[in-house]
Amino acid sequence: VYKRQYKNRDYDTAATLLDDFRRKFGRSAFIEDAEGMYALCFYYLSPGPSRDQTMTGQALIAINEFMSRYPHSEQIENFKTINTELTQRLHDKAYLNAYTYYKIGRYKSAIVSLKNALKQYPESSHREEIMYLIVDASYRFASNSVAEKQTDRYLAMLDSYLSFKEEFPESKHIKEVDRMAQHARDYLDRNKQEDNNI
């Protein structure tokens, strides 16, 4: 029955039937195929990165369970490829969520979200872009802040800048972040002189 649902691309129903089969017939000769199909159901149900990634998380769990139970399966290379693809989808989703805040000018929220994306997925393929956006959002956030908060925010921006420059010294964004850092330093120098004159 589950094979018919699977072939008809009714992956929700197939996953339910396959899960039932796995629980009832765990010692069956067909269990490896059933568990592979079960994992693939979630893969096929997983949407693109712009949508909710709950199914992607379930797919990764099912695929990793399959790979740990059947490390010598004929399907293992296919599942490794799928695992990489789904992980990339989660990285893309985290990046897109953070970028949305940046795009609409919510720089404080963007900074938090971008840092969380890096913390959650430090190996993300978007790492350079995320770190650049942290610098840029921090710069914009500091520039648009009230005077009494600008000093601390420019200092935080310079910390992000130094981290970015250390990790990506050859980035296409280097000239731009250097310009932002120089502006921040100029502001801090002027502000320091004004404080000394008081």
Residue ranges, per PLM feature:
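Acidic, polar-rich low-complexity tracts and alpha-helical solenoid repeat scaffolds
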Residues: 3-198
